[in-house]
A protein has these predicted regions:
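N-terminal hydrophobic/helix-forming segments and targeting peptides
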Residues: 1-354
């Protein structure tokens, strides 16, 4: 587990919000290149390794995570040197105030900033504390005025990411970090590429990571258009509801995600997932999603693409501190390897036998 923790720490501490995924793209290029036949990018910056098949009728299979994490973007530098921001991806305003962040300038400098909050002293006589709107939360780097902030290279459009380090829980079973959504998926495809290195598959495999998922599943549109897969496997992290009495319990294995508002699991795909999990002894749990994944975009492309999401759940996602189980990652990785190895022409035709 020590090695796995080190890998997770490395990938989760990369800073890359939607549209600014270069650090993760560089990471994946390095990890994928030794294990695939070629590495390509799409027009928005998604990156994918290709493993060619010797089978004449090999189906095209796309396995894609997403590189981006949630964060913010500077919308205005105020005269007093503080910043207004717009959110990149979904945030609960309750977790934004009084946190440390990194502001990334155009020339690559990291500027420490914090998100402001109103102390209780200043709310007395005004009806007490209220829920802030993110547009009203001030981000503060300690600058005297706008000119000083600009002298450090800060401009509107610069990105802001949580400043948070990965740590182990006391029982050494779980990890607390930022960005498990979706550096989970990034590490999954990296580990998959290494596991399949040198192996011959019954499919033409495209494996890598999309961009801009957190702002509308945008990268999934470009990659599925580019590669025209017959099957699409998203690899993504979902919110755990276990401490609130809901679905998704950390430590209970990978997810069979049968529903979310943007995607329904087709019967043929569901049978394939369950049969494979049971044959391989994979620990899994059923999951009804309330958000979406890249499968929601991919399955509607190119006349329709049978899709699913190979996922795990984590507590408190889209915040500085997400908590998740390493065993769930291992279960999901074993599941993904088993699925990819079985996706030959006959299996894909069976999934699509309407």
């Amino acid at each position: 587990m020590t090695t796995l923790f080190s890998k997770i720490k490395e990938v989760t501490e990369l800073a890359a919000v939607s549209g600014h995924e270069a650090p993760v793209r560089a990471y994946l290029r390095e990890k994928l290149t030794p294990h695939v036949d070629e590495v390509v990018t799409d027009g928005l910056g998604g990156i994918f390794g290709i493993k060619h098949s010797e089978a004449a009728d090999a189906p095209r299979v796309l396995v894609a995570s997403h590189m981006d994490e949630v964060g913010f973007m500077v919308s205005e530098i105020k005269p007093d040197g503080t910043f207004r921001v717009v959110e990149i991806g979904g945030w609960n305003p309750m977790v934004v105030s009084s946190q440390r962040f990194k502001l990334l300038t155009r020339d690559g400098h990291e500027i420490p900033v914090i998100s402001g909050s109103v102390p209780p002293h200043l709310t007395r006589g005004k009806g007490g504390p209220t829920m802030p709107a993110i547009a009203d939360i001030v981000f503060d780097g300690g600058f005297a005025d706008k000119a000083e902030a600009e002298s450090f290279g800060i401009r509107p459009g610069d990105t802001i990411v949580p400043d948070s380090s990965a740590i182990l829980t006391a029982n050494e079973k779980n990890i607390i970090s930022k960005a498990w959504d979706n550096r989970y998926g990034v590490l999954m495809v990296s580990e998959l590429a290494e596991a399949l290195s040198g192996q011959k598959l019954g499919n033409e495999l495209y494996l890598g990571s999309n961009v801009q998922e957190e702002v509308g599943l945008r990268g999934a549109h470009t990659s599925t258009t580019k590669f025209d897969p017959e099957v699409f496997l998203a690899v993504d992290c979902s919110p755990a509801g276990d401490v609130y009495g809901g679905q998704g319990k950390i430590g209970d294995g990978t997810l069979i995600r049968f529903y979310d508002p943007g995607h329904l699991l087709l019967p043929g795909m569901k049978d394939f997932l369950l049969t494979t999990a049971e044959e391989a002894g994979i620990k899994y749990q059923y999951y009804c999603g309330k958000g979406g994944t890249d499968a929601g975009a991919a399955h509607l492309k190119n006349g329709g693409v049978p899709s699913t999401t190979i996922g795990v759940c984590a507590r408190y996602i889209h915040s500085h501190q997400t908590l998740y189980a390493m065993d769930d990652f291992l279960a999901a990785q074993a599941f993904l390897q088993a699925l990819v190895k079985k996706l030959d022409r006959s299996t894909v035709d069976l999934i699509k036998n309407y």
